[in-house]
Every structure is written in structure tokens, then in C-alpha cells.
């Protein structure tokens, strides 16, 4: 579960990590009132879970009430990389002299958590990692002992953080690790961590991803789950109990089993397509569950075709076929082309059940993916 910026900053503030004064607003009038209360200049920031909000027009710095009204009116209601903006965070602007990056995640290759520090904050850290990996200092942590203060200071100094703020940066890094461990986070980061001219450090942005399987241990975070859903589709996925990730392409993908879905994503990319989503219907899926999956994918306006990749083990091919037929028979006209590949338990029965007036059936995964990619290209 990925928290919104305002939610993550609330968690940070409760842990004692400095964050700018801010107020959440859902109307233009609320945004202007919040800006007046905080005092100008303020930043008005779209609360949607996408990167590059600033470049896409989702973050604006304003100097007065008129500018605040104009910015809030422009941002509220906009579609930002496919997500509808219905809330903004009105936040005190930070006058900074430097931008840093700090974060904690799991290094699966090392089998340990890793804390990271860089003086290249305020930019896409993935690009920094690719172009100049030495610009990010990594410090592995033994989870049995936690992060020692000396490790955090070592990472800050090795990264080249100014001595005047190195101890404060190290303290925040230690707090981030403690949050990462205590809240069962999978990733936590601040980018940028701003340094002011009077040597204060402030978390100007916040990213926090929580292991959904551990939410039962955190009632405070569980309460945030509905609001944390990035859009209506993700909220619907939670309701249906699907593992779903929205992507930026136009070929919808439905499968049973994470590995099978990932393989399908890779093949869509291999054959020149762009995946629109990751959707795993799980094992033993009945007709209703399959119909719900199709309803979800069709609800994404970016989808131009859909490919089903089902391998029957617990999930029976005939049940899947019934679900596909039931879902498609609800439409007077099929919204988008659907390609189906069935294999395994009762696959032959399933292919006989499928209404070929509604779907295209392919025997191999490669053929199914190529057909779906072709359909998506033709729909554009």
C-alpha cells in the first residue's frame, strides 16, 4: 500500500521528522483559506500517486491569494498521468540552499535492509542510480540490531553532506529506518530533504510503501487504506481482492499467478506493446471473479485490447471460460478486443465453452500476446 504524500508526512511528523506546515484541501476555497492561514509563499501540490508531478503541472508555487485560487482551480479536477486530482496539499514553501536524498528499502540481493544517502536530491533518484551509482551511498543494516547512529553518520559523511547538517541528516535517516521496521514498510524515502540557510533539514516530500499483508498489525495505517488507493481502479481492486497495479500502456493483462502475469507483461513488451496493468485473479477463480476482472480492465480508458493468460491448476479452464462469457454477454457491444489463451486443467473444455463471437482464442501464449498487441495498435 502506497501512502499519499500527505499521509506519509503525517506519519513522519508523528515520528518527529521535520515536515513543512501543510493543510489538505478538496475545494478551491479550502485551498485559498489554507494558504492564507499558512502564509505565503506556499506550494499547492496534487495528491495523486505519480512521479513527475511538477513537470506535469501538478505542483505550483504561489505568492498570493489570487495565484493560490488560480493554481488550485487549475490543479483540482485535472487528470495527471491518467489519475484524477480531487485533493491538493497546501504547504509552506521552503527556502532552501541544498537538496538531499535519504531512503530505506530492502536489498534483496544482500538479504538486508539498506539505508541510502545522496547529495543529488530533488531529481529522479532512479536516473541518478543508473547514471552515477557512486553518487548514492548505501549502508546495510543488520535487522537484529537495527541502525546504529554511527552507521547513519558514516553514510551522511561519505555522501558528502555538509558537516553543519550531517548529524541532523543522520538522525533523520535513523528515524526513517525505525519507521521502516516498525511500520512494516517496503520502501521509505525523502526526496528532496531540504537544507535551509539556517542549517535546518526539512522533509519536503515523502514516500512510504507499506506491506499490505502486514496491515493487520497497524490499525492506524489500515484506516488509511481506502484513501491511499491511487484511483478508482485501485480502490475497486481492493474491493474485489485482486493484486492490481495500473501501468501506462494500452494492452490490458489478466492472469492467474504473479509469475504468469509477469511473463505476459514481458512478452507484451517483447512484441512491441505496452502493458496497461498487472492483474492477478489468483487461484481457483470462479466465473464471478473473472467477470469482475474484465470489468476492472474495461474501466481503464487507456486499454485498447485485453489478453487473458490462464494456466489451469487450481483454477479450472471451464470456470474461467464461463466467467469470460458472462462478463462479455453483459455488453451490447464488446468495448475492446479480448484474446484468450487457456492451458492446463479443463483447458480444452474451456476453449469449447468460449464464445468465439466475443473473443479470439489462441493456443499459445506467444500467439495470444502478438494478437492482443496488434489489436491495441489497430484501436489507436
From Swiss-Prot:
Binding site for Mg(2+): 191, 205
Enzyme class: ligase
Cofactor: Mg(2+)
Catalyzed reaction equations: succinate + ATP + CoA = succinyl-CoA + ADP + phosphate; GTP + succinate + CoA = succinyl-CoA + GDP + phosphate
Entry EC no(s): 6.2.1.5
Binding site for substrate: 256, 313-315
UniProt keyword list: ATP-binding, Ligase, Magnesium, Metal-binding, Nucleotide-binding, Tricarboxylic acid cycle
Domain ATP-grasp residue range list: 9-236
Family as reported in the entry's similarity comment: Belongs to the succinate/malate CoA ligase beta subunit family.
Primary role: Succinyl-CoA synthetase functions in the citric acid cycle (TCA), coupling the hydrolysis of succinyl-CoA to the synthesis of either ATP or GTP and thus represents the only step of substrate-level phosphorylation in the TCA. The beta subunit provides nucleotide specificity of the enzyme and binds the substrate succinate, while the binding sites for coenzyme A and phosphate are found in the alpha subunit.
Name of the featured protein: Succinate--CoA ligase [ADP-forming] subunit beta
Organism: Natronomonas pharaonis (strain ATCC 35678 / DSM 2160 / CIP 103997 / JCM 8858 / NBRC 14720 / NCIMB 2260 / Gabara) (Halobacterium pharaonis)
